[in-house]
């Protein structure tokens, strides 16, 4: 599928979305961002080795409705692209569509650690979109959350003493 065909497909998808929403408007949409490997064999243009997946193929960027599973947008990318490469440009037309055509729908963006980029956070905040991004554990996060671990330890110890004293 070439870029023109994909754009036509996405336009049809947008028209269908408007028709569906005219019948039943959702209260909220979870914009579920993801990237995945599409295995490819031979010498297709854009086919490349992806180190994360340890395989050859394409690495498309995808946005689904996290509630219904409906495809909102897909962008074919070569296999070498990192998960978040181009995500701000990919997402803005989606945000524009929802903010202009469906301003009453609450938007929440969800992504894994591959989308933990300040540009995406800023974009969501500037467009009034909530976001939840899973972060990989690291020393900085452990340090920032250490007080919670200490509090949990204290609560657990207190509860154990309460149980022991109850007998």
Positions of PLM-derived features:
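Short, conserved catalytic/metal-binding motifs centered on acidic residues
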Residues: 1, 27-37, 69, 107-116, ...
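Active-site-proximal, Lys/Arg-enriched surface segment
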Residues: 1-62
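Short, well-ordered loop/turn elements at secondary-structure boundaries
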Residues: 24-27, 57, 66-67, 103, ...
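Short acidic, glycine/serine/threonine-rich loops at helix termini
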Residues: 41-46, 72-76, 86, 118-124, ...
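Domain-level cores of phosphate- or acyl-group-handling catalytic modules
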Residues: 82-140
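An anionic, glycine-rich sequence signature occurring as long contiguous blocks
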Residues: 133-167
